[in-house]
Design a protein with these regions (language model features):
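Aromatic/histidine-rich interaction motifs
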Residues: 121-138
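Generic detector of well-ordered alpha-helical segments enriched in charged/polar residues
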Residues: 21, 116-120, 137
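N-terminal regulatory/effector-sensing and dimerization cores
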Residues: 30-125
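A short, N-terminal "cap"/entry segment at the start of jelly-roll beta-barrel domains
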Residues: 1-34, 51, 128
Length: 138
């Protein structure tokens, strides 16, 4: 099976330079919560990412269309449109787009002393209900 980390038509991604992240980690305000990477993958067919070696950031993934799945430890979850999940820092994990209905996702890597508070109880899929005048659109 084909497995792609990135390279999707229309994707957008920004990885902050290490020097910038280091400065944010030293600053009293931004050391509490800051992003390190941010992106958008539309119709990400064959998207797959596995991290056997844990990373020191939390990973927020918001699925706006399609479906996918993710694994934290031995627990596997399915995710569909208008759901998000947060992968914990320091824990091996994997995630993948559904090959028949590939997801469109926004994703953010974040860290900081307050990051665990924002990620609390978000290891399972959480629903988002966009409304007519919501800033979240699908």
């Amino acid at each position: 099976m084909v497995k792609l980390k990135d390279g999707f038509t229309g994707e957008r991604a920004l990885v902050l330079p290490r020097m910038i992240v280091d400065k944010m980690e030293e600053d009293p305000l931004t050391s509490m919560l800051h992003i390190t990477d941010i992106g958008y993958y539309p119709k990400a067919k064959y998207h797959f990412r596995e991290r056997k070696e844990p990373i020191n950031q939390f990973v927020f993934i918001y699925c706006i269309d399609g479906a996918g799945s993710y694994r934290i430890g031995d627990q596997e979850y399915n995710v569909s449109a208008n759901q998000y999940f947060i992968l914990p820092a320091g824990v091996p994990h994997s995630y993948a787009s559904n090959p028949s209905t590939p997801w469109t996702i926004y994703w953010i890597h974040f860290k900081g002393t307050a990051a665990p508070f924002y990620a609390k109880d978000a290891g399972r899929p959480m629903d988002i209900k966009p409304e007519r005048h919501s800033r979240i659109s699908t």
